[in-house]
Amino acid sequence: MNSYLEFEKPVAQLEARIAELRSAAEGDEVDISNELKRLERKSAALLTSTYSALTPWQKTQVARHPQRPHFRDFVKHAFDEFVPLGGDRNYGEDEAIMGGLATLRGRKVVLIGHEKGNDTESRLRHNFGMGKPEGYRKAIRLMDLAGRFGLPVVTLVDTSGAFPGVEAEERGQAEAIARSTEACLALPVPMVATIVGEGGSGGAVALASAERVLMLEHAVYSVISPEGCASILWRTAEKAPDAAEAMKVTAQHLLDLKVIDRIVKEPTGGAHRDPSAICETLANAIDEELDALADLPGETLRRMREERFLQIGG
């Protein structure tokens, strides 16, 4: 069952009407197929027009949709033979950041990403995708393995930001984020990062400092959440829509600013409406990018990463 966002209410009303008609038609001899088709066309057209004109704040809501596919969904539908690897070999395990060995279109890769969870229990277990120091150190360990064994690195970024708790600070959160970013930039193998939902602050950059950065059509990427920005500038989170507009958080804005390299189109109505379709589309896009990078020497890859970040804002 779809969970509707506030701006989707007209679509929700139409789809509810369609469901009522279908239910009423069961066992009824009256033919209402034409009316159903008319309403379905109207609903599809309304959904298309709504999603073709989303504001940055509405895109932020879509990026946070509770039914949006997360790391485990992409593992299930886009990758094969996933072997999870856990722990940072120093403090412990962090399930907000997952990783391991996987196969993408026959190519062995090291896969790393944020997992938010999809219900109360799993969200608590995965800490809502907010990585802790041990999570980023685990990512560093996996990137080191990738470099040693010549495996390309694929990252799926979806976090509101790194965990800001006192215990994370005590264990060196800032250092872990910085080291993870450094590990990305120093990799001697190809790296493709994708912002699949929220890309929040350094917690996202630590897994997204790649030579190729992709972004799903309705994902967002920023240094702070719109609510956080609004609270600082206007002393109220109610100005979040204005903050989202000003911060240029959308894939379309970030492509123009050369922060990302490619937008991956989502199904009409967002990735949550057809998770298997977006997984297939993203798998194809990542595979294409890895093909283009496969024969480049390590020094060239490192230089590409350095140059892409130095030219941002230039």
UniProtKB/Swiss-Prot annotation:
Pathway noted in the entry: Lipid metabolism; malonyl-CoA biosynthesis; malonyl-CoA from acetyl-CoA: step 1/1
Membrane spanning segments where? none
Might you report a single GO cellular component term? acetyl-CoA carboxylase complex
Enzyme class of the recorded protein, top EC level: transferase
- Which reaction is this enzyme known to catalyze? N(6)-carboxybiotinyl-L-lysyl-[protein] + acetyl-CoA = N(6)-biotinyl-L-lysyl-[protein] + malonyl-CoA
Q: Name one GO molecular function term.
A: ATP binding
Instruction: Report the PANTHER family cross-referenced here.
Output: ACETYL-COENZYME A CARBOXYLASE CARBOXYL TRANSFERASE SUBUNIT ALPHA, ACETYL-COENZYME A CARBOXYLASE CARBOXYL TRANSFERASE SUBUNIT ALPHA, CHLOROPLASTIC
Q: How does it assemble?
A: Acetyl-CoA carboxylase is a heterohexamer composed of biotin carboxyl carrier protein (AccB), biotin carboxylase (AccC) and two subunits each of ACCase subunit alpha (AccA) and ACCase subunit beta (AccD).
Q: Which family does it belong to?
A: Belongs to the AccA family.
Role, per record: Component of the acetyl coenzyme A carboxylase (ACC) complex. First, biotin carboxylase catalyzes the carboxylation of biotin on its carrier protein (BCCP) and then the CO(2) group is transferred by the carboxyltransferase to acetyl-CoA to form malonyl-CoA.
- Record's protein name: Acetyl-coenzyme A carboxylase carboxyl transferase subunit alpha
Task: Provide the gene name from the record.
Answer: accA
